């Protein structure tokens, strides 16, 4: 008797198929591991896709040196627990020049410490395919991007020159120096992600759960003061509020939301009534009109 697949089972099957397609078609793939909820789901799917073997590719974390401390601790804990090969890359030039979100702004910081750093890492190791956790429901430029997203030798994405994808048939051909960014979660929504995390009991960074945290209200956002590098502006005070994060990145550029959702069930319930994008908590999306597409054209995730 054939039992119809559930919605989550269909999404899972599609993602696993994509992982296996890349492993078969490319010489040196890598998974970009940002440590957030989407990366956690991606890691879980990669483990399933190749079980009982380990995924046949390393996990790459581009460290800006401004991630939440809990994210870094969770990253190292998961690498040890799951036994995957973890590569951590810094833009050493940016570290030397002390590029940071406070003195240089979110645009310069993101370009130097994320985009340029990612291009450096891909060139250094010679990866020809890179898995990412982007979803089409997150943001308009991601909504029009293919699952297999072609990049030229300079890692540039041209949204007007994308390859057709019909009936799950993917064009994996590339010339020397070119690469593909692959997004197995393209057709998932934020709610799908949380329901799958709940169903599969996937470990996630504790920052996603509501807790009393020291935050500063700045530029219309609640910023967690994660260390002493964040100096208070005149008139600012640190308050303890019950908050959690819908999205994670560099702590000075990521806003918390007031919430009492401290369990997976409560988060799923909150998502069922959410009417705003999780990206509203990312300061980098406010740099300028179409800023995400501009970043992606330059080689961003």
Curated annotation (Swiss-Prot):
InterPro entries: PAPS_reduct_dom, Rossmann-like_a/b/a_fold, SO4_adenylTrfase_ssu, Sulfate_adenylyltrnsfr_sub2. One of its GO terms (molecular function) is sulfate adenylyltransferase (ATP) activity. Its EC number is 2.7.7.4. Keywords: ATP-binding, Nodulation, Nucleotide-binding, Nucleotidyltransferase, Transferase. Gene3D superfamilies: HUPs. Residues 279-301 are annotated as: Disordered. The keyword Thylakoid does not apply. Pfam families: PAPS_reduct (PF01507). Coiled coil: none annotated. It catalyses: sulfate + ATP + H(+) = adenosine 5'-phosphosulfate + diphosphate. GO terms for biological process: hydrogen sulfide biosynthetic process; sulfate assimilation. It is an enzyme of class 2 (transferase). Proposed to provide activated sulfate for transfer to nod factor. HAMAP family: Sulf_adenylyltr_sub2. Sulfate-activating enzymes, NodP and NodQ, may be physically associated. Belongs to the PAPS reductase family. CysD subfamily. This is Sulfate adenylyltransferase subunit 2. It comes from Rhizobium sp. (strain N33).
